[in-house]
Amino acid sequence: MKLKNLIILLSCAVLIASCKGKGLFGKDKKHDKSDVTGWNYNDKNMGGYQVSKEKEQATGPGLVFVPGGTFTMGQTDEDVMGDFNNIPRRQTVPSFYIDKTEVANVHYREYLYWLARVFDPANDPSYQKIQDAALPDTLVWRSELAYNEPLVEYYLRHPSFNNYPVVGVSWKQAYDFCLWRSDRVNEGNLIDKGLAAKQGLQAQQGEDNFTTKSYLLGFYAPQPGKQGKKSTLKTAQGTPRTQVTMEDGILQPDYRLPTEAEWEYAALGYISQNPRPSQKEGKRGEELIMNKQIYPWSHNPNGMRDTRHGSWQGMMLANFKRGNGDYAGVAGGLNDDAIYTSDVKSFYPNGFGLYNMAGNVSEWVADVYRPLTLLDADDVAPYRGNKYQKMLIVDSTSADPTTRFARDSMGRVKYTDVTDKESMMRRNYQRGNVINFIDGDSLSQSNYGYGNTTLVSDKSRVYKGGSWADYAYWLSPGTRRYMEEDQSSATVGFRCAMSRMGSTEGNKRKTGNWWKDKRQKR
């Protein structure tokens, strides 16, 4: 009996020792080590430097992964408009994510509902301006010689149009939607991990709401949720914590509008023209594109109809205007079966699984418009529109982020423009605002602001792809048009994108080429 009790006591002692970070028989728990110092990671006895397990970027809601690569950007069809604004040029686009579909009415109304709940004018009349600024312009449906009042009244709100693309949204409104979506997705990630409670959502009012940056800086502290028993978040002292940092891999990068190069690359979907694309680690694909495409779809990429045998043979592959007065065809045999817009998941997806990259509605992209951007821009990740900013410091003597920085009326951390004086000694850029770099500034041959004799300005934004009201010519991804960033149209919507962090070919894949290590012979 005494021997039995002794065995039980010894077992308890071993368990207690293991709970204190020791292994069996009191040996130190194994830790990952630094390759440069040899010190343990995640060891409170060696400084407590925390390094999370290597995590791959999760695919955000609604997104599709697009592996990067090289392609010829620009005109793929005859330039019948004579714009000479999309000269073909070889470009490389880094991997990224993009929405499978255009943002629909139901998605945008979710955004409007959140604004109405958090920025309730009953609490502060000034909040009405925030709601008004986000409302789409439904009057874009009006035309002097057409009866479109039903669309003005019902298109945004009626449930029959829930999954139809939102229109009447300016570039600025689309940009703000991306900011809001980023914060809601990251807030949802915290709730899913038990690091924030759902109960705290209803208490958010005014500037006291979750934004990713304000959370990281400590301006906003959510009500903690119920974490699992195996929480991996620890402080330097080894105790559990609920405050997440970017290094933990839980928060995702921002949603944003795709660049023009990203959008065009994604629209072409050339992976479907690769005869043997790489499917898994260690299996190298062909570096080959069999056919150059005019349109996004892989079936009959130079025509408008499906050529495959079956009930779908002859069906239109996009929602567009076939000719004067022909938006849908003849009753009983409609060709694209959509007079105006259609469901965001209608028509055949392209090689990346993306819907309506041609037709339905044109889409805003991030770039500022210039006719010759393709000649001026970098040949990797090209983009015109950089205006560098930094967080606004209101108290430079404070080490506390909540007093060193400030928030605006919507709870977002305030930013200020980087000045030319701050940039002049840098090697990679010398100005804070480089929107008109080499095309409209004093160093270039073109000056788009001089004398106000042009419609092109630093507020002109590119939109891509054809719409329900366009002829087939505009459905080619290489075509490009522009509007001012505060304007909108019944034919222009948008979709969001997100930058890819880590491996170029996606999760469970390594970056670069790898060879097996060989043992040296003695």
Question: Model-derived features: where do they sit?
Answer:
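Positively charged n-region of N-terminal signal peptides that target proteins for export
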Residues: 1-5
